[in-house]
């Protein structure tokens, strides 16, 4: 985990090896990027996607890091960076007709979220 931050008032959190495809996670992250913490939580609560659970967990971790490590108020935080990168695929096999086997790739991804104080962004 890299802890390099662009400014002193930016806190980060990473979720690694999250089950789900990168494209499905990115469509949710694109919706919350640039929004305030409170607005993002409300949006994530009512989105009909399965990937909102792990994203909410990583977002709350980033805000907790901002509170604990930097002493920032959660009401002033904005999501400055949100990205998803590809993780390793778990390879499984499904039996098919006439003794064949089809390969199934269960994809994982890495989620990174950074929050910054609203006065700095």
UniProtKB/Swiss-Prot annotation:
Q: Which Gene3D superfamilies match?
A: Ribosomal protein L22/L17 (3.90.470.10)
- Matching NCBIfam families: rplV_bact
Keyword rRNA-binding on this protein? yes
Gene Ontology biological process terms from the UniProt entry = translation
Q: Which family does it belong to?
A: Belongs to the universal ribosomal protein uL22 family.
Please give one Gene Ontology molecular function term for this protein.
Answer: structural constituent of ribosome
Q: What is this protein called?
A: Large ribosomal subunit protein uL22
Q: Note the SUPFAM superfamilies from the entry.
A: Ribosomal protein L22 (SSF54843)
Gene field: rplV
Q: How does it assemble?
A: Part of the 50S ribosomal subunit.
The record's listing under HAMAP family reads: Ribosomal_uL22_B
Q: What is the annotated role of this protein in its UniProt record?
A: This protein binds specifically to 23S rRNA; its binding is stimulated by other ribosomal proteins, e.g. L4, L17, and L20. It is important during the early stages of 50S assembly. It makes multiple contacts with different domains of the 23S rRNA in the assembled 50S subunit and ribosome. The globular domain of the protein is located near the polypeptide exit tunnel on the outside of the subunit, while an extended beta-hairpin is found that lines the wall of the exit tunnel in the center of the 70S ribosome.
Task: Give GO cellular component annotations, separated by semicolons.
Answer: cytosolic large ribosomal subunit
Q: Tell me which InterPro entries the record gives.
A: Ribosomal_uL22 (IPR001063), Ribosomal_uL22_bac/chlpt-type (IPR005727), Ribosomal_uL22_bac/org-type (IPR047867), Ribosomal_uL22_CS (IPR018260), Ribosomal_uL22_sf (IPR036394)
The record's keywords, sorted A to Z, are:
Ribonucleoprotein, Ribosomal protein, RNA-binding, rRNA-binding
Q: Which CDD domains match?
A: Ribosomal_L22
């Amino acid at each position: 985990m890299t802890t390099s931050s662009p400014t002193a008032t930016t806190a980060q959190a990473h979720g690694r090896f999250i089950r789900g495809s990168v494209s499905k996670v990115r469509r949710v992250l694109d919706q919350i990027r640039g929004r305030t913490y409170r607005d993002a939580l409300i949006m994530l609560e009512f989105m009909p996607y399965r990937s909102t659970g792990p994203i909410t967990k990583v977002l709350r971790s980033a805000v907790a890091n901002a509170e604990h490590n930097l002493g920032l108020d959660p009401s002033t935080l904005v999501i400055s960076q949100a990205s998803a990168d590809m993780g390793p695929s778990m390879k499984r096999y499904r039996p098919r007709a006439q003794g064949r086997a089809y390969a199934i790739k269960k994809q994982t991804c890495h989620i990174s979220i950074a929050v910054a104080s609203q006065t700095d962004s």
